Swiss-Prot record:
Protein residues bound to GTP: D59, A60, R61, N62
InterPro entries: P-loop_NTPase, RapZ-like, RapZ-like_N, RapZ_C
Protein name: Nucleotide-binding protein Csal_2229
Keywords tagged on the record: ATP-binding, GTP-binding, Nucleotide-binding
Family from the record: Belongs to the RapZ-like family.
Length: 298
């Protein structure tokens, strides 16, 4: 039996993620009390053999004590031979406020208290910390559309099996903050910046003009090589620890030139050596899977 547990901040897309899994054949249960997880597994194990892929969502409406005990519960479930993934969805608090304002829905924690919406959003994050801290996959939906979130769930959750590592390289601009789902971050702001050349400003790091500019500087190649060597040294250790996902983020000031160039270079290099490589340019709104020949497939 494979169990996917969806949790995260209200308004971050848990219902969309659960629906995406249901559409892909998972037996889906929304807002399951954590205390009923073990009895549910026992019942489903005795049920139809077709129910081998289960998806449940857990949110902050659980009692705080139940949420604090979640890590222990998860260990008990895995100890019974259940293959279990915890997917945690989050988003910037400002984005969540905007989403609630747009839909005019009430936050779950404001229904039985006098908390403001902003207070409820922050309190919920505290309640869910035990789940967030042990999440196998953390997805920041701040800049994702519904379609993009469904695609991410299909790519990174439903298609996952066995000891396969999905390696994502993501470019970003520090102006908009570090991606919340990044496992490691490299800062490229020390490299020469094409932005200050008016003739290059309108291009991005995928364009030949920017590639030529950056590759004229030895430090650019040196940084790319250093990141590559570090990953080649430590990727086997991540695989050995049963890690399923690894997101390597590279940032520059605006996320248009230097970080994009480095992510393209790194992603195509590793796609020649392994499957499961993806690239994402946050500020350009681009994401793609790379087959082992290194050619992107959006």
């Amino acid at each position: 039996m494979q169990l996917v547990i969806i949790s995260g901040r209200s308004g971050s897309g848990k219902s969309i993620a659960l629906q995406a899994l249901e559409d892909l054949g998972y037996y889906a249960i929304d807002n399951l009390p954590a205390s009923l997880m073990a009895p549910l597994i026992d019942e489903l194990r005795e049920g139809p053999p077709s129910r081998t892929h289960i998806a449940v969502s857990i949110d902050a409406r659980n009692l705080p004590d139940a949420l604090r005990r979640f890590p222990v519960l998860l260990e008990e479930i895995r100890g019974r031979g259940i293959q279990c993934q915890v997917v945690y969805l989050t988003a910037d608090s400002r984005i969540l406020l905007e989403r609630y304002s747009a839909t005019r829905r009430r936050h779950p924690l404001t229904r039985a208290s006098e908390m403001t919406l902003a207070e409820a959003i922050e309190q919920e994050q505290t309640y869910l910390a035990p789940i967030r801290d042990i999440g196998d996959l953390v997805i920041d939906t701040s800049s994702l559309s519904v379609h993009e979130l469904r695609g991410r769930i299909a790519e990174q959750v439903a298609r996952h099996s066995g000891r396969h590592l999905t390696l994502t390289f993501e470019s970003f601009g520090y102006k908009r903050g570090v991606p919340l789902d990044a496992d490691m971050v490299f800062d490229a702001r020390c490299l020469p910046n094409p932005y200050w050349d008016p003739q290059l400003r309108g291009f991005d790091g995928r364009d030949a003009q920017i590639v030529t500019f950056l590759e004229a500087y030895p430090d650019v190649r040196a940084m790319a090589d250093d990141i590559r060597h570090w990953l080649e040294r430590w990727l086997p250790a991540y695989l050995a620890s049963n890690r399923s996902y690894l997101t390597v983020a590279v940032g520059c000031t605006g996320g248009q030139h230097r970080s994009v160039y480095l992510v393209e270079d790194l992603a195509h290099h590793f796609a020649q050596q392994m499957s499961g490589v993806r690239l994402r340019h946050r500020e350009l709104g681009v994401q793609a899977a790379l087959p082992e020949d290194g050619n992107a497939v959006s």
